[in-house]
Amino acid sequence: MVPSAGQLALFALGIFLAVCQALENSTSALSDPPVAAAVVSHFNDCPDSHTQFCFHGTCRFLLQEEKPACVCHSGYVGARCEHADLLAVVAASQKKQAITALVVVTIVALAVLIITCVLIHCCEVRKHSVVVP
């Protein structure tokens, strides 16, 4: 027996609501991870010659390697923070990213469910229609 489209839609809605509830109860990630004192001592501020080195971030000078490095602002990645991280730009926090991904997956799943139900219905109609010679 194939469940009706309404039953499948209610089932999908129940799963969606359960996942949303679980996401609300989860703890969010730390905004700034702690940095050990030993790590901080390996960096200095960049010299004036490197003020424009990072496109979307803060320049830090690596003492051991004697070269600049970038600490990217939120939403940017790359060696010089030159690439936008589109998911981070659309959804700034980790929780919003998870909810955005969940909404996209739910919409795709519902579209697949609707298409499947329509195809099943069409097959049933063809099966029950009488072929006139």
From Swiss-Prot:
Cytoplasmic topological domain residue ranges: 121-133
Q: What residues does the annotated propeptide cover? A: 24-38, 89-133
This protein's UniProt keywords: Cell membrane, Disulfide bond, EGF-like domain, Glycoprotein, Growth factor, Membrane, Mitogen, Secreted, Signal, Transmembrane, Transmembrane helix
One GO biological process term is:
cell surface receptor signaling pathway
Q: Which residues form the EGF-like domain?
A: 42-82
Q: Where are the transmembrane segments?
A: 98-120
Q: In which tissues is it expressed?
A: Skin.
Task: List cellular component terms (GO).
Answer: extracellular space; plasma membrane
The glycosylation sites annotated in the UniProt record are 25
Give the matching InterPro entries: EGF-like_dom (IPR000742)
Disulphide bridges, residue numbers = 46-59, 54-70, 72-81
MF-aspect GO terms: epidermal growth factor receptor binding; growth factor activity
Q: Where is the signal peptide?
A: 1-23
Extracellular domain ranges by topology: 24-97
How the protein assembles, per its UniProt entry?
A: Interacts with the PDZ domains of MAGI3, SDCBP and SNTA1. The interaction with SDCBP, is required for the targeting to the cell surface. In the endoplasmic reticulum, in its immature form (i.e. with a prosegment and lacking full N-glycosylation), interacts with CNIH. In the Golgi apparatus, may form a complex with CNIH and GORASP2. Interacts (via cytoplasmic C-terminal domain) with NKD2.
Q: What does this protein do?
A: TGF alpha is a mitogenic polypeptide that is able to bind to the EGF receptor/EGFR and to act synergistically with TGF beta to promote anchorage-independent cell proliferation in soft agar.
Its name, as the record gives it, is Protransforming growth factor alpha
Which species does this protein come from?
Ovis aries
